[in-house]
Curated annotation (Swiss-Prot):
Keywords: Aromatic hydrocarbons catabolism, NAD, Oxidoreductase. It is an enzyme of class 1 (oxidoreductase). Coiled coil: none annotated. It holds the Pfam family AcetDehyd-dimer. It catalyses: acetaldehyde + NAD(+) + CoA = acetyl-CoA + NADH + H(+). This is Acetaldehyde dehydrogenase. It comes from Albidiferax ferrireducens (strain ATCC BAA-621 / DSM 15236 / T118) (Rhodoferax ferrireducens). Its EC number is 1.2.1.10. GO terms for biological process: catabolic process.
Length: 306
């Protein structure tokens, strides 16, 4: 398939730049614009060197070129505070927005759990939850598809060096958004999320702990099989996703211990927390792109849809 869907990246920081490297390998996505607000940004400079068009005028600098350059998908890797306005202006032009901030104005997307359903719904904005959500919600979903989960709790530990200013600014949103997604996507009746930023040197890879309380006695064999099947699904786009220990059963509590090592595209391998976000976003966009190229989805400007 030689035709590709043109994409814009908003936010030339750690996540935006790593995502750019992944999109350049994609058989169906073609990154053509990088959008920032700081003319001295390293990310903008790097994107220019790779042949992308760039603007330091924010989304204002991109909008006049969207239709002329055929941009159909935009990735927003800025912050929760500006995402709603970015999304509104882009979807009005018929651009599908993949949200890598915790803004969560569109439905949550965790690829191995609900991506197929979202593609079928033809939404114009999907939210990639958070790094902790992408790492842990597949495990909660793997348990809840076997039997009801009344409580799901996750603890995501990331290295201080992999937590940029955007991550630090959005910590409250991280906990709220991840907790909601544990319930809405993971299937737990109640969800809770905790993030720990670890200053250890040398930096440690992302580690995640998942605890679930089931309504009834856990079916150990079925839950174990379900978790191992889900691990394989996540590894299709995040090869460094590993089950370190578990599932461990203690009465009605099921615990799973994970680590996530990045591919090392642009970010160091210990930044698995950022890598799982960019890999999930790229996977999501690829599935939408395949549907657009096959003629099964025709993106419409939101102004005309309303």
């Amino acid at each position: 398939m030689s035709k590709k869907i043109k994409c814009a990246l908003i936010g030339p920081g750690n996540i935006g730049t790593d995502l750019l490297y992944k999109l350049r390998r994609s058989p169906v996505l073609d990154p053509v614009w990088m959008v920032g607000v700081d003319p001295t940004s390293e990310g903008l400079k790097r994107a220019r060197e790779l042949g992308l068009k760039t603007t330091e005028q924010g989304v204002d600098g991109l909008l006049p070129h969207v239709l002329a350059d055929g941009v159909q998908i935009a990735f927003d890797a800025t912050s929760a505070y500006v995402h709603a306005e970015n999304s509104r202006r882009l979807t009005e032009l018929g651009v599908l927005v993949i949200d890598l901030t915790p803004a969560a104005i569109g439905p949550f997307c965790v690829p191995p759990v609900n991506l197929l359903a979202l593609v079928g719904r033809r939404v114009m904005n999907v939210n990639m939850v958070t790094c902790g959500g992408q790492a842990t919600i597949p495990m909660i979903a793997a348990i809840s598809r076997v039997q009801p989960v009344r409580y799901g709790e996750i603890v995501a530990t990331i290295s201080s060096k992999s937590a940029g200013p955007g991550t630090r600014k959005n910590i409250d949103e991280f906990t709220r958004t991840t907790s909601r997604a544990i319930e809405q996507v993971g299937g737990a009746a109640k969800g809770k999320a905790i993030i720990i930023i670890n200053p250890a040197e040398p930096p440690l890879v992302m580690r995640d702990t998942v605890h679930c309380l089931t309504e009834t006695e856990p079916d150990q064999a079925k839950i174990t099989a379900s978790i191992h099947a889900m691990i394989k699904e996540v590894q299709k786009y995040v090869p460094g996703y590993k089950l370190v220990n578990g599932p461990v059963f203690d009465d009605k509590r099921v615990s799973v211990f994970l680590e996530v090592e990045g591919l090392g595209d642009f970010l160091p391998k210990y930044s698995g927390n950022l890598d799982i976000m960019t890999a999930a976003a790229a996977r999501t966009a690829e599935m939408f792109a395949e549907e657009i190229l096959a003629g099964r989805i025709n993106l419409q400007p939101m102004a005309t849809v309303a």
